[in-house]
A protein has these predicted regions:
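N-terminal Sec-pathway targeting helices
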Residues: 4-23
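Membrane-interface motif at the C-terminal end of an N-terminal transmembrane signal
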Residues: 25-40
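Boundary/entry segment of secreted carbohydrate-active catalytic domains
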Residues: 36-92, 97
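Aromatic-lined substrate-binding rim segments of carbohydrate-active enzymes
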Residues: 77-137, 152, 211
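The substrate-binding groove and active-site-proximal loops of carbohydrate-active enzymes
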Residues: 99-111, 140-151, 180-192
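An active-site-proximal structural segment forming one wall of the substrate-binding cleft
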Residues: 111-129, 146-173, 194-206
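Active-site groove signature of glycoside hydrolases
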Residues: 131-141, 160-193
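Catalytic-core regions of glycoside hydrolase
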Residues: 173-184, 188-310
Length: 310
């Protein structure tokens, strides 16, 4: 019996010692934390509401500037670009439209390519992210000014792609596939399904993956990639970088032809059809969690009054 009590007392003493050590250790930690925190100093500051513009990257309003490329020397647009950069000081997005109509039936000259590179270089030294659009028309007359052959459009894509890729850190997204009135992918020799798809996929293969691409309508995107299933787009690293630029935004109930009337509908089997406004917006809600969506508000009307636009 005595041996049992001795062992029991010994065990109690061990447990007590463990608790004592733990308590002492806890006290030491508290002292250390107190000493550490007491060495930190800070200066309090008052805060007040402000209505200043928040220049968040890659979103918000953009300024739009255009260049008609020629065979003149590389620094032809230096003064104009400097003026543009000064004018757009309050925004962080700019849409640069590069008009190639002077070369609509020939390759771009070395001087022309040097001009384009110089323009991008100057903008890359500014705090702006660039939305880029190549085009052949500013007057709604693309059928008269775009190349007579699709091969010339493809040549221009190849010629400009290296320059674009070398400025991928400042070029955020490209709009369109070079063709159509205002490069908005309508009123063109090359907007049949075959030609449109050929140009879009060529551009996709040429442009660095770090730069987003975009097409004018959801119908265009579905037609190019032959699916209305966004989960299929998610499985393809190249396809998922293609967003939308809605240049008919709030111009009418169907955004000036972006959507169809209420009886329009697309399906998995008829992916190349145009849907009504509700169906297309639901499609965009899912797609544009993954890629950018932007565009231009046009035509003053009741749909872009503040109550409706909100």
């Amino acid at each position: 019996m005595k041996t049992f009590r001795t062992k029991k007392n010994y065990l109690i003493r061990i447990i007590a010692a463990i608790f004592t050590v733990a308590a002492v250790f806890s006290v030491l930690i508290c002292f250390a934390l107190h000493f550490y925190n007491s060495s930190i100093s800070y200066t309090s500051s008052g805060f007040a509401p402000a209505n200043d513009i928040l220049n968040n990257p890659y979103c918000g309003w953009y300024d739009m500037f255009g260049y008609t490329i020629s065979d003149a020397c590389a620094d032809t647009f230096d003064k104009r670009t400097q003026d543009y950069i000064q004018k757009s000081g309050s925004t962080r997005l700019v849409l640069l439209e590069i008009n190639l109509k002077n070369f609509n039936n020939t390759e771009l000259s070395d001087n022309a390519l040097a001009q384009i590179d110089r323009i991008f270089t100057m903008w890359s030294e500014s705090p702006h992210a660039v939305i880029l659009r190549f085009l052949y028309d500013w007057d709604g007359k693309a059928m008269q000014t775009e190349p007579d052959s699709i091969e010339t459009v493809k040549l221009h894509m190849r010629q400009t792609s290296d320059i674009v890729n070398s400025h991928k850190n400042s070029i955020y997204i490209m709009q369109g596939i070079f063709v159509g009135s205002f490069a908005e992918m309508h009123s063109s020799h090359y907007m049949d399904t075959s030609s449109m798809t050929e140009l879009a996929l060529l551009l996709d293969s040429l442009i660095d993956d770090d730069i987003y691409l975009s097409v004018r309508t959801p119908q265009h995107l579905r037609t190019i990639f032959k699916t209305a299933d966004i989960s299929k787009l998610k499985s393809d690293g190249h396809r998922i970088r293609m967003g939308l630029f809605n240049d008919g935004m709030l111009g009418s109930y169907i955004d000036v032809g972006t959507y169809g009337p209420e009886n329009y509908h697309f399906s998995d089997e008829e992916y190349d059809k145009k849907g009504n406004r509700s169906q297309e917006i639901a499609f965009q809600d899912e797609l544009c969690l993954l890629v950018p969506n932007g565009g231009e508000v046009v035509l003053d009307n009741k749909y872009n009054d503040i109550d409706n636009a909100a």
